[in-house]
Amino acid sequence: MAKFRQMGSSIFFLFLIIISLCSAHKEAFSSTDLVQMECLRVPPLEFAEAAKTVVDAITKAVAIVSKFDKKAGKSRVSNAIVDCVDLLDSAAEELSWIISASQSPNGKDNSTGDVGSDLRTWISAALSNQDTCLDGFEGTNGIIKKIVAGGLSKVGTTVRNLLTMVHSPPSKPKPKPIKAQTMTKAHSGFSKFPSWVKPGDRKLLQTDNITVADAVVAADGTGNFTTISDAVLAAPDYSTKRYVIHVKRGVYVENVEIKKKKWNIMMVGDGIDATVITGNRSFIDGWTTFRSATFAVSGRGFIARDITFQNTAGPEKHQAVAIRSDTDLGVFYRCAMRGYQDTLYAHSMRQFFRECIITGTVDFIFGDATAVFQSCQIKAKQGLPNQKNSITAQGRKDPNEPTGFTIQFSNIAADTDLLLNLNTTATYLGRPWKLYSRTVFMQNYMSDAINPVGWLEWNGNFALDTLYYGEYMNSGPGASLDRRVKWPGYHVLNTSAEANNFTVSQLIQGNLWLPSTGITFIAGLVS
C-alpha cells in the first residue's frame, strides 16, 4: 500500500511536467510539433488533479481487493484476487508512462512520438485492466464480486473522465493506394519494419539463422537454459537494448510470463511447429481467463518470431488462452497461436501481427488492444456439438478509447477438422464482447466457412447500436454482403475514404511509428 501512496504523489508530479509539454507555447515548436503537443482538452492543472484522483481510486481499490487474499484459499477467487492486484498495479504504472514518452530516452525508444496518441493508449489500457479485474470474478461468490465491483466503480469512472480530457489525434494524410500486383509480392516477405524496430532487430527478423543471442534455451541441455521461464528471469529489467532469446527446436511444456519490467525482449524460435510452447490451463479447471494463458507478455517492445504458442485444453474446457499480449509496440511475426476458445488475448496496448496462423473456435481473437493483423491465416476449428464459432470479440467499452482490430490482407477459412462439418457448425466474423466493440475486415479472402449473415449477437440486442463493425473490399464466397446483418452499428464501407480510417496509418497513427512505404507493410489500402 505504501508503494501506491508514493506512486500517487510521483505521478502527480509527472503529469505536471507532461501537461506543460502538451500545452506548450506555440512559438516553442514547429507546426508539426504543435499538433503533437496540444493534446489536452482541459487546463493542465485540471488534468493533473484528475490523474491524482485516478491513483487515489486505484489505491483504495487495491485495499478492498487485498482484504480477501488470505480468506480465498486456492480457488478461482484467489486467482481473481491475484489478477486484480497485478492489473491495478499495471494501471497505476501506465499512468506514470506519460512522462517517458516526452522526456525520458527510455520512453522515446518505446513510444510513437505522438504524446496525445500515447496518452490515449495508456489510459485505455488502465481502463481495460480495471474491467479485466472484475471479469476475473465470473463464476465466483456473488458477494465478493459485488464488493469488488463497488471498489472498482470509482476507478472506472475516474479513468473514463481522464480519457475524455485528451484530444483525439487529427486525421493523417491518406496514404496512396498500392496496386494489387504489388500486394502479391507483399505476402512473400517482411522487408520493411516499424520505425521503432532498430536496424539490428530488422536483421534478426529477416535472417533465418540466429548467430547472436543473449540467451539460448534448449530442452536437450545444449543451451544456457532448459526452460524459457528461466531465460526470461535472467533478462535485464527495463532494458533499453534488445535482449535476444533463441529458443531451439523442441516442445516446451510451461506457462511463461514476461512481466512488465522486462522490456525489449526478442524471442526467436526455429519455426512454426518446430519451437512449440504449450500448456493446458483453462477456466473449467479453476483459472481465470487472464491467468489461463500459456504465454503472457506485458513488457514493452516485445518481438516474437517463428514460434508456436498453444493451449491444448480443448473446447470442453471453455476459456483457455494460448497467448495473452499487453506489450506496447509489440510485433508477432511468423508465429502460430493455436487453441479453441479464447486463443489469442490481445488484451491491451498496440500490436502488429504479420504472417501468423491463428486457430480457434469461440472468440479466438479477443481483447481491447489496438491491433492490426496483416497477411495472416485465420482458421476456425471444430468445437463442441451445436457450438457457433466467432473469430473476434473486441472489448472496447468506452467510445473515447482508440482501440480496435483491423484484419487486412488475410485468409479467413476453416481448419482441416472443420471442413467436414461446415453444414453443422456456423462461423461468424465476430460478436460484441463489450458495448463499443470495434472490428473491421478489409481486403481479405473469406471462404465459404463464413456464415452469410457475417456477424453474431452477444446477447440479444446488446451493443448492436453502439458497436462498430465494418467490411471493405473482401473477396471469396464468404464475403458476399447480400445477407449481412442489418444492425445500426454494422457498416459496409463503400469508399476508400471510409476504409482509410481503419488502416495502419489512421487506426494506430502509423505514419508516425510505422514506415509509410514498402511492399511488405502496407500503411493504407490496395487498389
From Swiss-Prot:
Q: Where in the cell is it found?
A: Secreted, Cell wall
Quick one: which pathway?
A: Glycan metabolism; pectin degradation; 2-dehydro-3-deoxy-D-gluconate from pectin: step 1/5
Q: Which residues bind substrate?
A: 289, 319, 431, 433
Pfam families according to UniProt: Pectinesterase, PMEI
- In the Enzyme Commission scheme, what number(s) does this protein have? 3.1.1.11
Region named Pectinesterase inhibitor 32: 25-165
Tissue note:
Expressed in siliques.
Example GO CC term: the record gives: extracellular region
Going by the record, the broad EC class of this enzyme is hydrolase
Q: Which UniProt keywords apply?
A: Aspartyl esterase, Cell wall, Cell wall biogenesis/degradation, Disulfide bond, Glycoprotein, Hydrolase, Secreted, Signal
Q: What is its main location?
A: secreted
Q: Where is the stretch described as Pectinesterase 32?
A: 214-511
According to the UniProt record, which cysteines are disulfide-bonded? Answer: 356-376
Give a yes or no for keyword Glycoprotein in this entry: yes
Q: Which reaction does it catalyse?
A: [(1->4)-alpha-D-galacturonosyl methyl ester](n) + n H2O = [(1->4)-alpha-D-galacturonosyl](n) + n methanol + n H(+)
Name its GO BP terms in alphabetical order.
cell wall modification; pectin catabolic process
Q: Where is the signal peptide?
A: 1-24
Q: What positions does the record give for glycosylation?
A: 110, 209, 224, 280, 423, 494, 501
Q: Which GO terms describe its molecular function?
A: enzyme inhibitor activity; pectinesterase activity
Could you say which protein family the record assigns here?
A: In the N-terminal section; belongs to the PMEI family.
Annotated function: Acts in the modification of cell walls via demethylesterification of cell wall pectin.
Additional remarks: The PMEI region may act as an autoinhibitory domain and prevent untimely PME activity during transport.
Q: Which NCBIfam families match?
A: PME_inhib (TIGR01614)
Instruction: Spell out the protein name for this chain.
Output: Probable pectinesterase/pectinesterase inhibitor 32
Can you name the source organism?
Arabidopsis thaliana (Mouse-ear cress)
Give the gene symbol: PME32
